[in-house]
Structure formats: C-alpha cells, structure tokens
C-alpha cells in the first residue's frame, strides 16, 4: 500500500501554536499543540515574543509531521492559518524582529485612533478597508513600531524592514527568508488594504504613515507561497495556503453560500456571515471583510469581533485560581439553578463589536454574599453567549437572516454553554464532528491547490454535524436575562456615570 497524501495545517493562535495533519477525507491523523507566554508590559498592552511564535510553531509542526508519517502518511503541502492583526516588523537582512509582536488585543494606540476619527477620517477608512478606526487593526500598531523603535522609520523607508501579520512572518521563516507575502484575508485586517481594488491603498498608507516598501505581496488564499527550507522538515514542502484564523474557520465550516454563518469561540469570539461576491457595508459597526479569495474570486463577509471569550475562563484559571481546568466550568455552571443575577462583562482590553469602546474595562455586577466560584464560572461562560447575541442582532439589522449557527473552537466542547447559546439566540446551533475547523480551512486551501480536495460543493459533502442544539428557553426568561446583560454593559462603558 502506498503512502497516504496528507496536508499539514499550521494553526498559530493567540495563546498556543497547533499543527494538525488531515488526510484526503479531511480526517485528523495527528495533532500537536503547545502554549507560549503572553506579555503585558502596561495596562491594555499585549505582546508576544516573535521567537516564541516561531519556536512553538516549528516544534508542533515537526511533532505532527513525524506522528502522521509514522502512520504511513506523506505530507504533500502546508496550509497556514493565524491570529490576525497581530503585527510584526523585522529586518530583511537578518530576519530578526525589531520589537515584540503587538497582539491584536493590544490597545496602546487607542488615542491615535481617536485622533484620526476626530479629524473626520473614519468614513474614508471604512469605505476603503471595510474596517473601523480601532487599535485592534494592524495599521496603527505598525506606525507605533516605526515611531518608537529607534531608527525604524528611516530603515523602513530605505527598504530594509519588512512588515507582516503572523502568517507573513511565519512564511518568511518557513521559506528561509525567500518569500515576503500574505493573502487577501490577512491583508484585509490591516486597515491598509482596499477590499474593492484588492491592493494596498495609497491613501490609507499616507493616513497611517506606513511606507509601501514595508509591505508584503498579496496573493490568493490558495496559491503558491514558495517551499520550506529543506533543513526544517528534512525535505522541501510547498506552502499552498494562507488564511486568517476566522476566515479559515469560515471555510472549515463550509460557509460558502451567502447567509451561512459561523461563530468561533477561542481566546476571543468571532461571528462571520458570508455575504457573497458583494461587500456589504454595515450600518451597525460590524466589519466588512474578505471571507476568502480563491482563483481570483473574492467572497466577502460581515464580521463581529469579541475580544475576550475563552480568555475569561483562562483568567479564572490562571489569574484567580478558582478552577484548575477550563473543563471544570461546565459542571460548575450546570450545578446552579440560575445565574444568581451575576454578570461578567470581560472588557479586559476594551469592548469590541458592536460597541467599539477601547476605554471600557471589565466588570462583575450583581455580586452578593451568596455568590461563589460557580457563579463566576457561569458568568464567564454566559458572557460569550450574550455578546454573540448582540452581534447576531446587529447582523440581522444589516440584512442577515441565519437559519442556524455553526460553532467551533475550544469552548464549544462545553455542552452547557452551547445549549445556553441556542436558548439565548432562539436559534438552532450546530456543532461539527471535526472541531478543528480553523486548521481544516487552511488544510482545504492547501489541499485544493495540491489537487487533494475538490471544489466547494465536493468539500461541503465532507462536513458532518456532531449535534444540533435546539432552543428551549421560555421567552420571558430570555428577555429578563438579556435585560440584565444590557444593564451590565451600560455600567461597563467608558462613558458610564460613576
């Protein structure tokens, strides 16, 4: 029997790096994962050491590759998916970053964004990039690096530095510094890319003061991105797919038709609805973004971004020490008859969509002497569901009419949370058999380019549902819970009275 052709999917996330090998039937053959440190040098600042990103990625890739090939598989291509917006600048000659990566959650440029908005720039920025003026995106992060690292701006203007999101940095390292490129989905998250012309926008570059010489080439999501340095894996492997993590999950959930919608629950939560070949401007402060670009065809999406989802549970574990594992929260939440009036608004780094309040900070409301660790665990889980409900309401106002929501990410292993989500949304929620949908999306792109996977219709037949969660909550209960949540959000907003 010959070796089975497979795809290595690299999933470089906010708190961990993962590598997963998929076969031609989109089944998982091998998985490797490792966490890496987070750095918080100041209030609202979040950084990663780029060498931690690279070392952890290389480590898990080698582990998964070795495990799969021990089972008779042969990896024929690599697909990469990544935490988006996180910004790096490195020296083209040495490959060394000039500073830690500034993570998507980082809010250090909030005042810069506010100043640009006060000068009347947000309408132009949104019209061209589909995004709002917010420190979430890469442009002001890049400008901050150029302004705060000694000599960086001059080196950038002289063509000695390279900018990239995490995919671009990994591609540079994987190819031994031979390829400086990104894909359209990652480019569309920078505030520098025109989603209509499909190119870097000169007016946006001027506004954010980012030299064009810094920027990578923008390619399709399924494309030839060069070959890996043979020293890394013992032989060169073609990199045939790049995609931002939420777009990767959109592909992995087979949301190829307009109106299909998915929500991913990892460090943050991201709801994405496919809008087809036409970009739909949001009237409710959602993001108009690129879902994927394949064979020159672009499909667009509306996205709502929640900065803190699973990270709230991680805080309960690592910050407060009230749970040993994230899995404990399910039994704690289920053991309560109700939430006891306790709400957590986890605005640790501000509020994302639809509020976009960079100055908001987290709150716990409704605490009494009867409140215990179970109430905190339940409040952390419920918070992701309430925020999803806010996003779905905005999407419906913008014309989306979802029949069901497909969910993925580490949090959705928690059946209690997914049922609460269905109840709160009053909408069926589908959980897939293959939970690694982000990595699966990257694998599909590389596998499609390699000839291992077929078109959208063929790949859609591979998707299988593990369980459907149907809503069962009385309307009166839902209404009361949502009213309590909205009151908690009002107390959290930066303009709220003391």
Curated annotation (Swiss-Prot):
Pfam families documented for this protein: FGGY_C, FGGY_N
Binding site for ATP: 14-16, 267, 310, 314, 410
Keyword Kinase: yes
Binding residues for ADP: 14, 18, 267, 310, 410, 414
Binding site for glycerol: 84-85, 136, 245-246
Record key words, sorted: ATP-binding, Glycerol metabolism, Kinase, Nucleotide-binding, Transferase
Activation/inhibition comment: Inhibited by fructose 1,6-bisphosphate (FBP).
GO molecular function, one term: ATP binding
A cellular component term, taken from the record's GO annotations: cytosol
Binding site for sn-glycerol 3-phosphate: 14, 84-85, 136, 245
E.C. code: 2.7.1.30
Function, in words: Key enzyme in the regulation of glycerol uptake and metabolism. Catalyzes the phosphorylation of glycerol to yield sn-glycerol 3-phosphate.
NCBIfam families listed in its UniProt record: glycerol_kin, PRK00047.1
Name of the protein: Glycerol kinase
Annotated source species: Rhodospirillum centenum (strain ATCC 51521 / SW)
Lineage, broadest ranks: Bacteria, Pseudomonadati, Pseudomonadota, Alphaproteobacteria, Rhodospirillales
């Amino acid at each position: 029997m010959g070796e089975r052709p497979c795809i290595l999917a690299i999933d470089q996330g906010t708190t961990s790096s993962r590598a997963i090998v998929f076969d031609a039937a989109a089944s998982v053959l091998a998985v490797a994962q490792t966490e890496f440190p987070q750095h918080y040098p100041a209030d609202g600042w979040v950084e990663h050491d780029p060498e931690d990103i690279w070392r952890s990625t290389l480590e898990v890739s080698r582990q998964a590759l070795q495990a799969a090939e021990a089972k008779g598989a042969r990896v024929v291509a690599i697909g990469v998916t990544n935490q988006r917006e996180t910004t790096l600048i490195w020296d083209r000659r040495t490959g060394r970053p000039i500073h830690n990566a500034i993570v998507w959650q980082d809010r250090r440029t909030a005042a810069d964004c506010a100043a640009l908005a006060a000068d009347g720039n947000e309408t132009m920025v949104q019209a061209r990039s589909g995004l709002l003026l917010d420190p979430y995106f890469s442009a002001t992060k890049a400008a901050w690096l150029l302004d705060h690292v000694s000599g960086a701006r001059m080196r950038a203007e002289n063509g000695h530095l390279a900018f990239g999101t995490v995919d671009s940095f990994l591609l540079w390292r994987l190819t031994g510094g031979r390829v400086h490129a990104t894909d359209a989905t990652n480019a569309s998250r920078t505030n520098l890319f025109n989603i209509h012309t499909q190119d870097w926008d000169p007016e946006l570059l001027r506004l954010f003061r980012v030299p064009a010489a810094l920027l990578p080439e923008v390619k399709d999501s399924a494309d030839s991105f060069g070959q890996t340095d043979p020293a890394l894996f013992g032989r060169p492997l073609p990199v045939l797919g790049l995609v931002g993590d939420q777009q990767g999950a959109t592909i992995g959930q087979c949301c190829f038709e307009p109106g299909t919608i998915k929500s991913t629950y990892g460090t943050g939560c991201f709801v994405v609805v496919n809008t087809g070949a036409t970009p739909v401007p949001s009237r409710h402060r959602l993001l108009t973004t690129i879902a994927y670009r394949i064979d020159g065809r672009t499909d667009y999406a509306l996205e709502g971004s929640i900065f803190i989802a699973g990270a709230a549970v991680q805080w309960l574990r690592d910050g407060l020490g009230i749970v040993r594992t994230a899995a404990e929260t399910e039994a704690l939440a289920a053991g309560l008859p109700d939430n006891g009036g306790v709400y957590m608004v986890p605005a640790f780094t501000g509020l994302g969509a639809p509020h976009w309040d960079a100055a908001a900070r987290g709150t716990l409301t409704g605490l009494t002497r009867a409140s215990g660790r179970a109430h905190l665990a339940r409040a952390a889980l419920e918070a992701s569901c309430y925020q999803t409900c806010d996003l779905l309401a905005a999407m419906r106002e913008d014309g989306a009419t979802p029949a069901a929501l497909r969910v993925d990410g580490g949090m959705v292993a928690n059946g209690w949370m997914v049922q609460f989500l269905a109840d709160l949304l009053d909408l069926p929620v589908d959980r897939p058999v293959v939970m690694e949908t982000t990595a699966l999306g990257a694998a599909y792109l590389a596998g499609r380019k390699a000839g291992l996977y077929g078109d959208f219709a063929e790949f859609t037949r591979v998707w299988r549902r593990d369980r459907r969660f149907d809503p069962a909550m009385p309307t009166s209960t839902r209404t009361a819970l949502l009213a309590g949540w909205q009151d908690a959000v009002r107390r959290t907003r930066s303009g709220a009275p003391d």
